Amino acid sequence: MDMANQLLDELAHGNFSHLTLNLSQNGREIAILQKQLTGFDDKQLETFVEQHPAMPNDTRFKIMCTSFLNYARDVDPWSAWSSSDLIFEFYQCLINCLINDNAPHIEMLIPVATRETEFIINLAGKLDSFHLQLHTRSHQFLSHISSILSRLFNSIKPPRGNASSTNIPGKQRILLYLVNKLNNIYFRIESPQLCSNIFKNFQPKSMLAHFNEYQLDQQIEYRYLLGRYYLLNSQVHNAFVQFNEAFQSLLNLPLTNQAITRNGTRILNYMIPTGLILGKMVKWGPLRPFLSQETIDNWSVLYKHVRYGNIQGVSLWLRQNERHLCARQLLIVLLEKLPMVTYRNLIKTVIKSWTTEWGQNKLPYSLIERVLQLSIGPTFEDPGAQEITIYNGIHSPKNVENVLVTLINLGLLRANCFPQLQLCVVKKTTMIQEIVPPVNERITKMFPAHSHVLW
């Protein structure tokens, strides 16, 4: 029992160098412990910890120590699955120690908890990837980790006002780390709606001075996740504000670091389509360190279709990229938002030609219908159409008035429709922006960023 006594003595005095589930770091010590603890049942190990002379008088701390000895005694180094109960039991006991603000050696336990969290999330993800073979539920292990971390999150009160990080408990210094881990897990287990409670209880605007003291990479990650949450809820402007702030902050970090470059790519995967919905045109030059030429070329094709009002081109692009758009939960929001921006650009082109070159301010519905036919291409209404899809089932040249009225209601077109006369009348002017305002200007006026977003 020499090794077990030595381990408990280390733990009792706040030395947690051997307290890890990662056998690549403490495999030798675990092998010795396993040999020494063979023959001890759970009750004997519990008594052994309880009677150790140096052990602090803290129930949760003792339970954690006992759990680690159980793990050392029974772990199978060749099978994470067969040892999973032991692994997750110890991790839960470790996190439970931190729930108590007066836990022994809490300042030293905090970095242990973050280190083991990285290990356990990686392990849980691997086990979940084999859920069919293991006959477990989809995302079972990551969901369990999220429930453990959420209890720790709920035990930490976010700082308020201008409190300095030197005057707050250590747990609050890992609060943003916990927030990001939980939100990342919720996205991974396909339950992003669970992020709502996290964002509701952690609002940087009410603790701005303290928020800015967190590590910059954690601030960037928080904004990225908040942007994704807003985008899933169709709050496009709010989402873009967060993606843009995250990306601008990331540019302050050394781009020689590959992890930073990868994070930049993650942000741009959402910032680019969000900006397109808002009518923003991308300057690709500054983005080249983060995007491959193939990716730039692919997005450029979509930008071109939207800019020139090509509904058929937009639908084809979405269909061709359906798989990766679904993986990023972008398909629905693009299907919902992009067509009206594309229609707006199409009608703008018609008005420019009709009013500038011909001096007319009355657009016949028949003219617009013909333009829509060219833009939309074959539809499900055509005799030769084979199927109705999410791409062709909504667009029809017959929807002239519907398109015009929707654009007018959205503030993207200043005009009057006269159904009986089959005319759309616009202002007589060569200043096209007076008839077709910029998309970004209109959206930001109609859907301004929430006050709690601007921080």
Swiss-Prot record:
InterPro entries: Csn12-like, PCI_dom. Its main location: nucleus. One of its GO terms (cellular component) is nucleus. GO terms for molecular function: double-stranded DNA binding; RNA binding. GO terms for biological process: cellular bud site selection; mRNA 3'-end processing; mRNA export from nucleus; nuclear mRNA surveillance; poly(A)+ mRNA export from nucleus; positive regulation of transcription by RNA polymerase II; post-transcriptional tethering of RNA polymerase II gene DNA at nuclear periphery; transcription elongation by RNA polymerase II. It is found in: Nucleus envelope. The keyword Transmembrane does not apply. Residues 220-431 form the PCI domain. The keyword Amino-acid biosynthesis does not apply. It comes from the Eukaryota. Component of the SAC3-THP1 complex, which functions in transcription-coupled mRNA export from the nucleus to the cytoplasm. SAC3-THP1 functions in docking export-competent ribonucleoprotein particles (mRNPs) to the nuclear entrance of the nuclear pore complex (nuclear basket), by association with components of the nuclear mRNA export machinery (MEX67-MTR2 and SUB2) in the nucleoplasm and the nucleoporin NUP1 at the nuclear basket. THP1 binds to RNA in vitro. Heterodimer with THP1. The SAC3-THP1 complex interacts with CDC31 and SUS1, and with the mRNA export factor MEX67-MTR2, the TREX complex component SUB2, and the nucleoporin NUP1. Present with 1140 molecules/cell in log phase SD medium. This is Nuclear mRNA export protein THP1. The gene is THP1.
